[in-house]
């Protein structure tokens, strides 16, 4: 028997005993981050399927993953996130066709985001809702970059899931959740009406989904950051001549970036801003 347990019979005065015996679901911070990183790799592999199949109107469940060049089914040992791509040197085992680097990139991105969320939020219910939002944002980013669309099949259920999750965790915060949806979607509705359709309805629904998860304060931070990032990139495109004024630039990835920053560091940014200018 561990002598430390004998010397400390009272549960209240023995933190190590409490952690190991009375609260087994609590993980040390590093273990939680590592666990979320591994979960993120697996989720990222699934998101690759979502990014490819949803725009094509295909099922994300069946058939199993296959090589896009030859159609050969991908065996489980060739479908291990990141590692299989490295082992096969980015090629299909059957036909040796090149497999895009985007597949491991999406897996790694999702894993890193999940680990960051674990570090920032810890073992809380908020972490669960954060992981759902991050997964949706990664999928939306990939689809918008490829097809310049933000699928309703992700954003509309996302509004419901975000609202229900937040209301379940904090029933007293219902006003913040509803205001978040109204602010996130309403700002883009105003832009759409004012510009005569200069911005798509997908951005409006994405804004509403972000608001459902983040609440009205953090969704404002997310939108401001997204607009700033999008403006910087647009200026870069125009100055280098790589895109003209009328060339479409998907805005979803910039909103997703703003939402990620707001989710992970938004409260700190708000506290800094309010203290700096109004403190």
Model regions and ranges:
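Short, positively charged and aromatic/hydrophobic N-terminal segments
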Residues: 13, 21-22
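Long, highly hydrophobic alpha-helical transmembrane signal-anchor segments
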Residues: 23-55
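Functional transmembrane core segments of multi-pass inner-membrane proteins
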Residues: 36, 127-235, 271-279
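Membrane-proximal soluble regions of multi-pass membrane proteins
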Residues: 47-102, 251
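Select subsegments of transmembrane alpha-helices in polytopic membrane proteins
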Residues: 99-107, 152
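Transmembrane helix-loop-helix
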Residues: 117-129
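Interfacial loop-to-transmembrane junctions
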Residues: 235-261
């Amino acid at each position: 028997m561990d002598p430390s347990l004998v010397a400390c019979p009272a549960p209240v005065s023995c933190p190590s005993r409490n952690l190991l015996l009375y609260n087994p679901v609590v993980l040390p911070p590093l273990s939680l981050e590592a666990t979320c990183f591994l979960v993120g790799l697996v989720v990222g592999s699934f998101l690759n399927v979502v990014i490819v199949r949803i725009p094509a109107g295909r099922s994300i469940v069946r058939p199993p993953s296959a090589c896009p060049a030859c159609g050969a089914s991908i065996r489980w040992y060739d479908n291990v996130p990141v590692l299989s791509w490295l082992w096969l040197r980015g090629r299909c085992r059957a036909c040796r066709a090149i497999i895009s680097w985007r597949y491991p990139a999406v897996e790694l991105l999702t894993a890193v985001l999940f680990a960051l969320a674990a570090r920032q939020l810890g073992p809380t219910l908020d972490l669960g809702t954060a992981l759902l939002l991050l997964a949706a944002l990664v999928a939306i980013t990939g689809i918008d970059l490829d097809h310049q669309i933000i699928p309703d099949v992700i954003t509309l259920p996302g509004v419901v899931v975000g609202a229900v999750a937040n209301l379940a965790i904090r029933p007293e915060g219902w006003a913040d959740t509803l205001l978040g949806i109204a602010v996130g979607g309403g700002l883009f509705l105003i832009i759409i009406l004012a510009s005569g359709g200069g911005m798509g309805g997908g951005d409006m629904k994405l804004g509403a989904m972000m608001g459902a998860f983040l609440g009205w304060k953090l969704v404002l931070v997310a939108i401001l950051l997204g607009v700033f990032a999008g403006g910087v990139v647009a200026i870069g495109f125009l100055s280098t001549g790589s895109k003209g004024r009328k060339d479409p630039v998907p805005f979803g990835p910039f909103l997703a970036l703003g939402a990620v920053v707001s989710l992970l560091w938004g409260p700190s940014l708000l506290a800094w801003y309010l203290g700096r200018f109004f403190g």
